[in-house]
Design a protein with these regions (language model features):
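Conserved alpha-helix/loop element of class I SAM-dependent methyltransferases that forms part
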Residues: 50-92
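Class I SAM-dependent methyltransferase SAM/SAH-binding core
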Residues: 97, 103-155
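Conserved Class I S-adenosyl-L-methionine
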Residues: 244, 256-336
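Class I SAM-dependent methyltransferase Rossmann-like catalytic core
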Residues: 32-56
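A short glycine-rich, Lys/Arg-flanked "PGG" loop and its adjoining helix->strand segment in the class I
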Residues: 179-190
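Conserved catalytic/acceptor-binding region of the Class I
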Residues: 196-271
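A short SAM/SAH-binding and catalytic strip from SAM-dependent methyltransferases
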Residues: 163-177
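A short acidic, Gly/Pro-enriched loop at the edge of an enzyme's catalytic core
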Residues: 156-164
Length: 336
């Protein structure tokens, strides 16, 4: 996994494990603590909702890639243009797997982006799948969205094939990431597309100098989160020390036409109150997760940032923003 997945405030990725700050919440699962899903699940769902503009960009790109008129192109991020109008035409996608779906926000988005497709939301946490089913029902998508309770990559054998497989911030929870990519690739139908959302950039939500404590707080949070993430990865069963090259993982799985693109979420100041509260919750979780790795000055600054009554707190200061980048790597199965 790359640096964007550090447990710092931003967008959670409700994958197979949940409990830590930032994009994740896997402290309970990875460290043996009990997880209160009544508290955590709405937090994960709201985080994914905040990221919806970014996911919509990614879904439009996937539609263009899957269009019969899509141009063959390189992997290096140059625009791979489809024929005029291709992105607006729904390609022939009949079945989608959302692996590590969490509460189903992206599952529902994919169902709307591909209106002829059945979507199977796959997650290891039944409480999150309950929310996914409820969300699909609220949006009138219950007839097209189904759920499957399974760990990744184990437990996927009964899933069957798919034209599109999406997995966001789930595979880095697997010790053998290369093997996990290969396992997912094995479920692609001929010509199907595997899209892995891993990487990007660490989010930003405050200026370098916030007028409290030592400037550069977020850079130091990044460093602490990197250490936390490395420890999490090292503790996974069957963890392998390998170069995290997602396009190479896709190629090693026998897939072709690798492409990579990054998508931006830019919520400028002043932030809406619910986004402020979401960042506040993430900061609180960061304190719990690796506050002991911070010096007393930074810990004091974080304490002020999460205080709803402090004028310097994240819920009250006018300069808070949210800037985030997610990277999606794709490749296709061979046509028969």
């Amino acid at each position: 996994m790359s640096s964007d997945d550090r447990p710092v405030p931003a967008e959670p990725s409700p994958g197979p494990r949940s409990g830590s700050p930032g994009r994740h919440a896997h402290a309970g699962a990875d460290q043996g603590g009990a997880i209160d899903w009544e508290v955590l699940a709405p937090f994960l769902e709201r985080g994914a909702e905040i990221q919806t503009p970014l996911y919509e960009q990614a879904a439009a790109w996937l539609r263009a890639l899957l269009s019969p008129d899509a141009a063959e192109g390189g992997a290096g991020g140059a625009p791979e243009a489809a024929a005029p109008g291709a992105a607006s035409r729904a390609p022939t996608v009949r079945r989608i797997l959302d692996v590590g779906s969490g509460p189903g926000v992206v599952s529902c988005l994919l169902a709307r982006a591909f209106p002829d497709a059945e979507v199977c939301a796959v997650d290891a946490t039944e409480a999150l799948l309950v929310r996914a089913r409820a969300r699909a029902d609220r949006l009138g998508l219950a007839d097209r969205i189904h759920t499957h309770h399974a760990e990744v990559p184990h437990g996927l054998d009964s899933l069957g094939g798919a034209d599109l497989i999406w997995s966001s911030k789930a595979l880095h929870h697997v010790g053998d990431q290369r093997g996990a990519v290969a396992a997912l690739a094995g479920h692609l139908r001929p010509g199907g597309l595997l899209a892995v959302c891993e990487g990007g950039l660490a989010p930003r939500f405050l200026p370098r100098d916030i007028g409290v404590g030592r400037p550069g707080l977020q850079a130091r949070l990044d460093a602490a989160a990197e250490d936390w993430f490395a420890e999490m990865r090292a503790a996974l069963p069957d963890a392998t020390d390998t170069l995290e090259d997602w396009p190479a993982f896709l190629a090693n799985a026998g897939l072709r036409t690798p492409r990579t693109r990054s998508f931006l979420l830019d919520l400028p100041a002043p932030l809406a109150d619910d986004v402020r509260r979401y960042i506040q919750a993430n900061l609180s979780r960061a304190v719990e997760e690796y506050g002991d790795q911070l010096d007393p000055g930074d810990l004091s600054t974080l304490t002020r940032l999460v205080d709803p009554h402090d004028p310097a707190g994240i819920t009250r200061r006018p300069d808070a923003f949210l800037l985030s980048v997610q990277t999606v790597h794709t490749a296709r199965a061979q046509e028969q």
